[in-house]
Amino acid sequence: MSEIPAELYYTDEHEWVLRTGDDTLRVGITDYAQAALGDVVFVQLPDVGAELTSGESFGEVESTKSVSDLYAPVSAKVLAVNGNLEASPDLVNSDPYGEGWLVDLQLDADDMEAALGGLLDADGYRGVVTE
């Protein structure tokens, strides 16, 4: 069974979201997603400062099996990208909830609760992966 940490939020598209501050979030792909992808060989991420729209593609994860789009869990600005993935894309496999994070996002603090409210909790995501 895939690891699904209770403190994170999730999307139907297998991204996880961690609230890191009043107006900031960290995003990655779930353990379930990395296992389904297989060995990750390349990660394409947006530029810092890019504006992401909830539900729209913001990058790609390429594995030995396939190429999968990454979808923005919320509408926000890219604050940082994980530069370590350029040389070590396999971090997505070995540590999807830690060193394998993808992007840090910033949104208006007033919009945070509504944005997180649109995401799944661990139990909701568990329902998605066991269907």
UniProtKB/Swiss-Prot annotation:
The keyword Transcription regulation does not apply. The modification N6-lipoyllysine is found at residue 65. One of its GO terms (cellular component) is cytosol. Its cofactor is (R)-lipoate. It comes from the Bacteria. GO terms for biological process: glycine decarboxylation via glycine cleavage system. Binds 1 lipoyl cofactor covalently. InterPro entries: Biotin_lipoyl (IPR000089), GCV_H (IPR002930), GCV_H/Fam206 (IPR033753), GCV_H_sub (IPR017453), Single_hybrid_motif (IPR011053). Keywords: Lipoyl. SUPFAM superfamilies: Single hybrid motif. It holds the Pfam family GCV_H. Residues 24-106 form the Lipoyl-binding domain. The glycine cleavage system catalyzes the degradation of glycine. The H protein shuttles the methylamine group of glycine from the P protein to the T protein. The glycine cleavage system is composed of four proteins: P, T, L and H. Belongs to the GcvH family. This is Glycine cleavage system H protein. It comes from Mycobacterium sp. (strain KMS). The lineage of its organism: Bacteria, Bacillati, Actinomycetota, Actinomycetes, Mycobacteriales. The gene is gcvH.
